[in-house]
Amino acid sequence: RQERLAKLFTEAVRRWDVSFTENLPDYMKELVSFFRKGWEDYLLGYYEEAEWLAAEYVPSLDEYIK
């Protein structure tokens, strides 16, 4: 059972397919959601940096850290 859950969890994270989490316990569903949100925030940060670069804008330290 644990091995099956581990495989389901790993596939859910790899695919980012929320429907793939249907057979996971609630705590694992929350982890998939947490990882997905973290990845989204990470990518949005890079997107903002790319916009700054394209506009030749140098953000303040506070903007950059945010």
UniProtKB/Swiss-Prot annotation:
- Cited function: Involved in defensive oleoresin formation in conifers in response to insect attack or other injury. Involved in sesquiterpene (C15) olefins biosynthesis.
- The disulfide bonds in this chain are none
Q: In which pathway does it act?
A: Terpene metabolism; oleoresin biosynthesis
| Cited Pfam families | Terpene_syn_C_2
UniProt EC number: 4.2.3.38
Q: Where in the cell is it found?
A: Cytoplasm
Tell me what this protein is called.
Alpha-bisabolene synthase
Keyword Lyase part of the UniProt annotation: yes
The Swiss-Prot or TrEMBL record lists the needed cofactor(s) as:
Mn(2+); K(+)
Q: Which UniProt keywords apply?
A: Cytoplasm, Lyase, Manganese, Metal-binding
- Gene Ontology molecular functions: alpha-bisabolene synthase activity; metal ion binding
Q: Does the keyword tRNA processing apply?
A: no
| Coiled coil segments of this chain | none
Q: Which organism is it from?
A: Pseudotsuga menziesii
Reaction(s) catalysed by this chain's protein: (2E,6E)-farnesyl diphosphate = (E,R)-alpha-bisabolene + diphosphate
**GO cellular component terms listed in the entry, alphabetical order:** cytoplasm
UniProt lists the family membership as follows:
Belongs to the terpene synthase family. Tpsd subfamily.
Q: What coarse category fits the chief subcellular location reported for this protein?
A: cytoplasm
